[in-house]
Amino acid sequence: MPGTAGSIWCLTCHGDVEVDYHHTTEDVGIALGQAFARALGDMRGIQRYGSFHLPMDEALILCAVDLSGRCTLNWDIHCTTEKVGDFDVECAKEFWLGFARSVPATVHFVQFAGENTHHILEACFKGAGHALARP
């Protein structure tokens, strides 16, 4: 996501992934949200709104962001599997909830098409990078 938004960030996280990825994924979302908020500073001179439709093969996802100072996550994403490799698909929503709370921002994800869970989630993250590059 940060590379797509025009910058490159490096984050190292050590979590209890031998149990599951839930808390680690949520904590990464929180940490990136806090870093993004610090990078925005007082938000002077930025556009408040950004959105992007991203096609990833058969998947089509809209990500819309409002840097409102209020936390809302609308997750209208419907994946066909519970896992991508070892990753629990529900953790993607937890990542974005942690991110939205930490900025704070309103973030919407809407799925228009898609069956392959990998493509759907990849479109969410890349679409968010493009939407966040617009404000």
Name each model feature, range by range.
Residues 1-135:
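Structural preference for solvent-exposed beta-strand-turn elements
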